[in-house]
């Protein structure tokens, strides 16, 4: 994340290198195709999948909380947030309303719902907890990270309160809701956020209870380095960040224990290029394949670095990203079946890391793999085959949006329309932006803000999963200058005004080239 330096409107405008404009134009092409395709998917595939009788979104034929609510619904929300706010605030938001009305079962903990027969499907306790935790971590957190303290935050808060109210597992440190390491890793990620968003002590107390439960094992190191087990790596990293931010007494203890975890994984669980295996030591069958969650795990390492104030693992991350240039990772078969989900997860992790450790070889790898296997950008936009709505395909849509916003540096054009292009690139002075449209367009160019602080209550932009990374952000109270590179005109705006949106008009086929500082 970069917050720009601001200069007065009267300052002498710096010269913009032609290469910066060329890079922004190329980013506009990449992001324009991606966002227009996502908008097609939203209207042609996803919104029609909402059941007209219940209002639920049975994206894969079911409404449950382990897959549909956790992995499909959040990226329906992201797609609407980026390309159609009316859809977000209409049928997409209504899914949130009806799932609470129909599915709440144990207080506000939901259960799956048979939308065809109109009845709840009540699982055993462990599955109930697992599904609700999945919904919070993969679903609601992802939405809250981009919408802030909206109704999705209220839902997240309610479920977490009741998950811990009904915790049944006795430990020497107090009751916890599960012995499942995946659930507990998810809980660490949720509780750390809720603590900083609310200031309520019970959330960090519960998170410490989980950390103490695992660190009570003298040599605790998670064995599974991919999903359904690796969640605790990033969860412990984020907890350390929050402990450090709030000068809590356990911060130093957790720092030492977590370094042992990280060093052991590097020593035993990585190949020579820094990519992680599915299992820390086992190499039989699928265990010997590379984990598509390698980037998720390194997010925890970078969070550790930022928390302790030393770049202990940054070089390891940089080297790993640079090694992606090697032929071995060209169209690597992450899931063993060339699933879109394997590519999408691996690339998502890489984007999180590139946001913190920019490495040219890593950006090139991401662009190439996205174009071929996830966005599939060689297909004509008007006739391109769209993604489905089941969870593996929805994860693809997630990463398409993340990749597109990397190329816009977090800028969003509202309303989006097919044929619009928007791209941006950093310069030493700020940002260069290129926009064009094949049809007349008028709307607002909306800039990102430091959501980590404004929404999440984080002192720093702690590296974390289940978010849209911050690229170029504006400080609400600061003054910025937008310069038209073709006319030379300069327009002052505050960060708040830029976040709400700068009014623009595009003539068909005529590019607007702008610089902001």
What do the predicted segments below correspond to?
Residues 4-516:
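Glycan-recognition and catalytic cores of secretory/periplasmic carbohydrate-active enzymes
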């Amino acid at each position: 994340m970069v917050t720009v330096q601001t200069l007065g409107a009267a300052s002498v405008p710096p010269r913009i290198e032609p290469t910066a404009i060329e890079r922004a134009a190329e980013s506009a092409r990449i992001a324009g195709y991606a966002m227009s395709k996502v908008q097609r998917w939203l209207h042609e595939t996803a919104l029609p999948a909402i059941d007209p009788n219940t209002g639920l979104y049975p994206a894969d034929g079911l409404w449950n909380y382990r897959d549909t609510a956790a992995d499909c619904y959040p990226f329906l929300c992201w797609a609407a947030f980026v390309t159609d706010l009316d859809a977000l605030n209409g049928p997409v938001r209504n899914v949130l309303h009806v799932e609470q009305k129909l599915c709440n079962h144990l207080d506000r903990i939901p259960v799956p719902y048979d939308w065809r027969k109109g009845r709840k499907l009540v699982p055993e306790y462990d599955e109930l907890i697992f599904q609700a935790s999945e919904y919070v971590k993969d679903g609601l957190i992802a939405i809250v990270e981009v919408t802030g303290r909206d109704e999705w935050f209220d839902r997240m808060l309610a479920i977490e309160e009741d998950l811990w109210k009904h915790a049944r597992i006795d430990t020497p440190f107090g009751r916890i809701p599960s012995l499942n390491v995946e659930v507990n890793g998810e809980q660490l990620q949720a509780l750390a956020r809720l603590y900083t968003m609310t200031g309520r002590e019970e959330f960090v107390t519960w998170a410490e209870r989980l950390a103490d439960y695992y660190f009570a094992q003298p040599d605790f190191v998670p064995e599974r380095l991919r999903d359904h087990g690796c969640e605790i790596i990033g969860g412990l990293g984020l907890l350390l960040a929050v402990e450090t931010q709030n000068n809590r007494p356990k911060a130093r203890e957790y720092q030492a224990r977590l370094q042992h975890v990280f060093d052991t994984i590097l020593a035993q669980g990585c190949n020579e290029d820094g990519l992680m295996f599915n299992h820390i030591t086992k190499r039989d069958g699928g265990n010997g394949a590379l984990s598509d969650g390698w980037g998720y795990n390194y997010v925890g390492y970078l969070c550790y670095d930022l928390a302790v104030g030393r770049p202990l693992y940054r070089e390891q991350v940089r080297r790993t990203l640079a090694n992606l240039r090697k032929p071995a990772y060209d169209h690597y078969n992450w899931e063993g079946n060339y699933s879109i989900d394997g590519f999408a997860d691996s690339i998502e992790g890489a984007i999180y890391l590139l946001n913190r450790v920019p490495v040219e070889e890593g950006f090139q790898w991401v662009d190439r793999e996205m174009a071929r296997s996830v966005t599939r950008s060689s297909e004509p936009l008007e006739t391109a085959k769209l993604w489905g709505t089941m969870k593996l395909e929805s994860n693809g849509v997630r990463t398409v949006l993340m990749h597109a916003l990397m190329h816009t540096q977090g800028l969003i054009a509202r309303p989006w329309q097919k044929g619009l292009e928007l791209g941006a690139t950093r310069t030493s002075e700020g940002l260069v932006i290129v926009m064009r449209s094949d049809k007349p367009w008028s709307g607002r160019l909306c800039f990102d803000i430091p959501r980590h602080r404004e929404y999440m209550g984080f002192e720093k932009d702690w590296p974390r999963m289940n978010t849209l990374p911050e690229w170029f952000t504006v400080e609400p109270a600061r003054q910025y200058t937008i310069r038209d590179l073709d006319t030379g005109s300069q327009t002052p705006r505050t960060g708040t005004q830029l976040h709400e949106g700068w009014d623009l008009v595009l003539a068909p086929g005529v590019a607007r080239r702008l610089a902001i500082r």
